[in-house]
Structures are given as structure tokens and as C-alpha cells.
Amino acid sequence: MTTSTTSRLAIGASCVLIFGATALAQTSPSPAPAAAPPAPKFEPTATITTPGYPGVGPADSKLRIVNLPGGKKLHLLPATLDTTQWGWFDNAQAPVLRVNSGDTIALETMMHSHNQVVPGTTIEQIKKTRTDFPGRGPHTLTGPIYIEEAQPGDVLKVTLNKIVPRAYATNFNVPGLFGQFPTLYADGQVKYLYLDLDKMTTEFLPGVVIPLKPFPGTLAVARKEPGRYSSVPPGEFAGNMDIRDFVVGTSLYVPVHVPGALLWTGDSHAGQGNGEVNLTALETAYREFNITVEVIKGKPLDFPRIETKKSWISMGFDQDLNKAWTQTKAQTVKLLAELRGVSAEQAEKLMPSVSDCRVSQVVNVKKGIHCLNPKNARDREDLERPTRETPKYLVSHAKDADLNKAMNDASMGMIKMLEADKKVARLDAYGLASVAMDCRVGAISDAEKNVHCVMPKSIWVKQ
């Protein structure tokens, strides 16, 4: 298969409020993923290497800059083999772009595996891109981008201004590998979907229409540890968070670990369910991903946060969903104490009544939970946690002392419900749950942890 080298994406930004400054140690630290086996060092060059045009010569960075009002700059960053890496983060990687705090970047992203997962690629070929490169992630990452003022201990704010996806997306489960239930799905399938960017919908199945909600699955700064690491697990550097609320108009705040921060993005999504259970979302690439970067000094942060118009999003990650919850709870308590000006003990008591917590994903080695926390004390998030079908939702509820098992039971319950009640084929039900199901964390105690997975009935439309 030939590898396409073009894919378009741009990023833009808007301003948001700043957070409190007190840092809190991570409550449930996870062991850092082991470095990948040694591989040939990728040495990027500034030479354009588009097939058919060898030796064009070094790129001129000045030709990638557009001046904006107020003395700011817009940087244009195309996705080529020279401006992307496949599957690795490495803080020794030479920057492909250098910008200043306050600058805006309009960049492109590629589909998985350097644009190899495109309409026509079979599930067997997709599986081969994973099995032939053990330890390597599937994501093609545009970057790294060096932000001149950023130093360890600073915070990098990245605001999403605009997202323009390609005209298509894919959803697939790799046979017998990855996903929430790899042993139950030894068979796999790939679906290619048309994205109607006028209506902002895609038809997943005949009569099943999914609203599009584009967001970057992966946005990362460099880790503090040297070496080459898979792009799959998220962490304190952000990375493969797969938080579907991270959309245009929101901002990521992430601690800086190395000079220049080194910013990457990829794993571009047109939409996703909370859980992403079959491994993939509506996987696409961006013709334009428009962002603005800002370095914040003197306000240390120990873990990423996301700011929306009305909420702050806290998060946690671990291979064990119970520990991911413990970390998310600690980050949420810290955030609520800052927002409301109360003690940690008071914030912990407040959390169940104001924080809307969801299972972000369970397929990225480190599973994720995130909580939406209203900025205004009078506001409330969506705390609906149904245990049976409602006029609005199909519902699958499970409880167990182990949050991993509760999540497994609730999500599989929804998949079986789609098969039995909606007559959706087995692999299609797995995929539909991955792109449209919303798994919510309910009441939590040592003895019992509740997960409520809901599916909006509104996605079934009359033919």
C-alpha cells in the first residue's frame, strides 16, 4: 500500500479563565509505561519528500507564517512525512515548527498509520499495521511544535478555535486484539462512513444517524522522561485522553515538562461514545485544526484540566478503572475546593451533588474517567443516572465492588440490548456502542460502584 502524505488540519483559539494555583500530588500514581523496544532513530529533516517530487529542497519556515492583527502570527503546518511521527512520543524529536506564546497554528492531521487507514483498506491490512510494529501506537501525530517561552513548571494553555474534518471517517475493531472485549470479538470489521459536514451527521447504519462532535483524541506535550513511548496511554502530559467534551471553544491546560513544551496532535475524531469500547471512535483526519497556544507562568498545575464555557473538566487515568476513579476524585476535589473556596473535606462532600463523571475510554492501556464541574455554584451538570429505559434513552445499568466489572457488565448489557431489541448485527452493535453510548459513573462506595450506560433514542430516524 502506498502512503499518502497529504492531510489537512487547522487549529484556532479563544480565551478562557485561569485556575487556582495550588498543586496536589497525584493520589493514585500509575507506573509509567515501559519505554518501547529500541527502534531505528527517526531523524527528521526540513526537506520536502512528497513522492514524485524528490529533492525539492529545504522548507522555508517564513513561508508558513501569516501576519494577524495586533502583531500576532498564524502558522500554517501541513501534515507530511517530515512533520509527523507514527505511533511514538519522543522528547528528543526535532521540532517541526517554532512559535511564540499567543500565536495561532492552522495545521493538518493524517489518518492512522501515516494515512494507510483510508476507504478501501481492509480489516486484515489494518491489523497488520499493528502486529507488524509491536509497541507502536496507531496514531500519526503532527508535531512536535516548540513554544519558545515554555519551560518546565509552566502551564501550556491550548485553545481550540476551529476543526474541519475530512469527508469520511472509519470505525473498526481489530480481530482478537485491543478494545474492551478482545476475546469475545475474535472477528473484526471496518466501516467507512461519509461525514455530512453541512448537517454535521453521519449515517452509521441505515436509519441510525450519529451527530458529529469533532474533537482531538490526542493532544500532548512531551513527557519528562527521555526515550520513545507509545502514543496510546494518556498521562500527566495529556496525550490520548479521548475526552469527547474537548471540542471547539474549549481549552486544555497541561503542565510543561521540557523546554518548549513540544506539542503534538493526532487521533482526530468526528465523534465518540463515552467508553469507546470497540477501540475506535469516528476516526478521521482534519483538513484544518486551528489552535492558539499560551504559556502561563507562576500558576503550577500537576495534571491536565480542560475548560469549557460553563465547566472545568478534571480527569484521571490508570490501567485499573478503580484507581482511575481515585485519581479523578482527587483532582475533582482539588478543583472544587479552588472554585468554591472551601476545604478539601467540604469539596469531597459537595462532589456527588455537582460533578458529572463519565467513563472517557477503557481501551488506551490506561483507562480514563473525567468529571464536568460547573463554574457557577448555582449551575448543575447532567446528573441523570437512570437504571431502566426512559423516553429519551436505552439504558443498561450495572453495579459491583469492582468498577472495571461494573463497566464491563453495563457496556455489554447495552451491546446485547442493541442486538436483541434493535436487531443490530453483532459487530455493528459493538461499533455503535463505541461511537454513541454514554457510560456514566453513578454512586460510588467501597462496597458498590454503579455504571449507567445510556444510548440516545434520537439516533434512530424514520426512513
Labelled PLM ranges:
Residues G12-A23:
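Bacterial N-terminal signal peptides
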